[in-house]
Amino acid sequence: MGIKGLSQLIADIAPFAVKEGEIKQFFGRKVAIDASMCLYQFLIAVRAEGAQLTSVDGETTSHLMGTFYRTIRLLENGIKPVYVFDGKPPDLKSGELNKRAERREEAQKALDKATEAGATEDIEKFNRRLVKVTKHHANEAKELLRLMGVPYVEAPCEAEAQCAALVRAGKVYATATEDMDALTFGSNILLRHLTFSEARKMPVQEFAYEKVLKGFELTQDEFIDLCILLGCDYCDTIRGIGPKKAIELINKHRSIEKILEHLDRQKYIVPEGWNYEQARKLFKEPEVQDADTIELKWSEPDEEGLVKFLCGDRQFNEDRIRSGAKKILKTKNTATQGRLDSFFKVLPSTGTPKRKVDEKKPLAGSSAKKAKTGGATRGRKPK
């Protein structure tokens, strides 16, 4: 889900924190990509006659085709991608995962009815709602990336948190995902739509975290509390509080604790046993691998390995795969020109910390000075 309504709230209050541009503007950049989000996009979008692409054995291959060609597109535009895969979901996410499972059950029932009625459009719609990225999909994508010479990272927990840690450490420029909670985890830069198909003709959106804080007049801690009020994957929300009210309350009271002290409990229903404190801790102290221990290396593609992996049972066209491998090799051999700012050392951010898997460190910089700009307008947009 990400953070409910956050992108629209930023557009309303801090539009200067968002830039739109083309993929070519990120030439020379290293970008950490939320792999699960990408695979989901590919499973939804890469289809033939409304159905996912499959091998001779009926195994889905849409995620492989999407990963192969979209990654080549990034490389041809001078971008060095590193894919970050989710690890074990945090316990706090169990409620959200249960809700997703229930929605899939409802979609399956609706699909059965649509199939019985022969409603083609409804069949395709509900089929898309049933899409789920599995461990098998992820493992196949990892093998493909290895053969392409593109690095990937296995996060111990949430991929967005690991991406943010890589950004803060100066290992990569930005996090690429559609989930706005990358900002809540402290990613200095968030890129949306980077891995979208060119056919969709949607500009890449670049969100600057520090500018968001400035526009909202919030510290990092206050921004996290705002995101919890808006709605995240880790706890319920207070019924009756939308985006406009949430930013108003945070600007006035500065924390959820103070909000609860002054809240009209008759008008706004607080969830019983609301675990907002645990959600806050998860955002401030996410379980991530120390970015300093991660080595990112882009190598030459294994053309024969790619042909063996993708052709044959998976039925990819050999000529196209060989052509793709040569394109990857060409980008590696010709990508010697860097960005002007790459001649200067990128210093790790000190604004938001990381912690190793076995360490717990508090979030630094949470007492950042508040800026003096902004106002609030209600907005709502899904992740």
UniProtKB/Swiss-Prot annotation:
GO terms for cellular component: mitochondrion; nucleolus; nucleoplasm; nucleus. Interacts with PCNA. Three molecules of FEN1 bind to one PCNA trimer with each molecule binding to one PCNA monomer. PCNA stimulates the nuclease activity without altering cleavage specificity. It comes from Anopheles gambiae. Keywords: DNA damage, DNA repair, DNA replication, Endonuclease, Exonuclease, Hydrolase, Magnesium, Metal-binding, Mitochondrion, Nuclease, Nucleus, Phosphoprotein. It is an enzyme of class 3 (hydrolase). This is Flap endonuclease 1. It is found in: Nucleus, Nucleolus; Nucleus, Nucleoplasm; Mitochondrion. Its main location: nucleus. GO terms for biological process: base-excision repair; DNA replication, removal of RNA primer.
